[in-house]
Regions:
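Short, well-ordered beta-strand segments
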Residues: 10-16, 61, 95, 119, ...
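Central regulatory/effector-binding core of bacterial HTH transcription factors
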Residues: 8-72
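Flexible hinge/capping segments at coil-to-helix
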Residues: 76-118
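Hydrophobic hinge/microswitch elements
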Residues: 54-59, 123-181
Length: 233
């Protein structure tokens, strides 16, 4: 992992709203022993992540491909001269507060969720429908609450009766008071109940040692998680 050197070290990460990408970033920063460094992490909309990497503002972008969004993102990546590398597949889960009427269910259908507000990260106006972080965004819903930060999501889940769909990876701040339940995805076109998590790097970017350390830490953070299936590179 990262060791100190006399040069000014730099690591810049652009990521969707996932705690594992933040955890890996913090662990790399804590391990670095150099005298001069600049570490930057941006939690962004999907389009901003692609643009950050395209313009070299950030060295790496962390994002998720769903069965629906991948159709658009697979075209957007080469258009931006970025290359996507998968890290792991994660099982989709429904997240609700422990007080929620559905909290004790063993499995949930989308019909079960129909009367409850759906929480999602807002993606702005450009390609927002296709750039969603949450799976099954293409399925219409009559109650929507959108926001831009993970803190609001945690607050909503613990204090209200809505839900969100995401990977089965709970962040540390979401362990208390929040329940994850697998959804029944049978009958959903093009869905196998998983999301592909990976990273993008500009095709002309030369990877720094710190960037390599960060990628290794991402793999380590998720290696023992029972809800993910890592890719071997």
């Amino acid at each position: 992992y990262a060791k100190g050197s006399s040069s000014h070290a730099r690591l810049t990460v652009s990521t969707q709203h996932y705690a594992f990408s933040v955890q890996a970033f913090v662990e790399v920063a804590e391990m670095y022993t150099g005298d001069e460094y600049e570490f930057t992490l941006r939690e962004c909309r999907t389009g901003e992540i692609i643009d950050d990497v395209r313009t070299f503002r950030c060295e790496i972008g962390i994002l998720v491909l769903g069965s629906f969004t991948s159709r658009v993102l697979d075209k957007a990546f080469p258009d931006a001269n970025v290359v996507f590398t998968p890290l792991f597949d994660a099982q989709v889960h429904v997240f609700v507060g422990e007080h929620h009427p559905l909290a004790k269910a063993k499995i949930l259908t989308l019909d079960d969720l129909e009367d409850y507000p759906r929480y999602s990260f807002e993606q702005g106006t450009e390609n927002s429908f296709y750039y969603a972080e949450e799976p099954f965004n293409q399925i219409p819903h009559k109650k929507e609450i959108r926001f831009s930060d993970r803190g609001t999501l945690t607050n909503l889940l613990t204090n209200h009766i809505g839900y969100t769909l995401s990977t089965g990876v709970l962040s540390s701040e979401m362990h208390t008071g929040i329940v994850s339940i697998p959804p029944d995805t049978r009958g959903l076109p093009g869905s196998n109940g998983t999301m592909q998590v990976g990273y993008i790097i500009h095709s002309q970017m030369k990877r720094s040692p710190l960037l390599e350390d960060y990628i290794s830490m991402l793999e380590n953070v998720m290696r023992d998680n029972p809800f993910v299936h890592p890719y071997k590179h």
